[in-house]
Amino acid sequence: MSVSDPIGDMLTRIRNAVGRKKTKVSTPASKLRARVLDVLQSEGYIRGYTQSEFVNGKAEIEIELKYYEGVPVIRELTRVSKPGRRVYVSVKSIPQVANGLGISILSTPKGVMADHEAREQNVGGELLCRIF
C-alpha cells in the first residue's frame, strides 16, 4: 500500500513511539526523510538514525529517539504542509515556534533546513513541520 504523505507518516511514527516511550522506531527510507532526520539530529531532537537494506530490496531507516531524564525531548511534532494543502513561506514570514524554543523545518531550493538556517541564508520554501 502506498503512503500519500511519507513525511507525515514518519512524523506520526515518531510521535507514536515517543508516546509509548520507545527508544527506536523504523520507517521506510527516502532521501527527503533522511534530510529531515539530519535536521532533527543536528538540532538535538533525536540521537541519530541508520539506514539498512533488507533482503526484499526495501530500505528502512531506524530512528533512535532521545530522552532527557526519562522525559522525551520531542514534546510536540506537527505537520504543516500536507498533500492537500501546501504551505509556502517567504524568508520574512517564517514563523517562530514557541518563541524561538522550537524549530520549523523547511524544504528550500538550497535543501532541507531549520528555520534559523533559512533566515541566515535568506531563503524561503515549503514549511514541512514544527517541532517543540
Curated annotation (Swiss-Prot):
Keywords: Ribonucleoprotein, Ribosomal protein, RNA-binding, rRNA-binding. Gene3D superfamilies: 3.30.1370.30, 3.30.1490.10. One of its GO terms (cellular component) is ribosome. InterPro entries: Ribosomal_uS8, Ribosomal_uS8_CS, Ribosomal_uS8_sf. One of its GO terms (molecular function) is rRNA binding. GO terms for biological process: translation. The keyword NAD does not apply. Pfam families: Ribosomal_S8. Belongs to the universal ribosomal protein uS8 family. One of the primary rRNA binding proteins, it binds directly to 16S rRNA central domain where it helps coordinate assembly of the platform of the 30S subunit. Part of the 30S ribosomal subunit. Contacts proteins S5 and S12. This is Small ribosomal subunit protein uS8. The lineage of its organism: Bacteria, Pseudomonadati, Pseudomonadota, Alphaproteobacteria, Hyphomicrobiales.
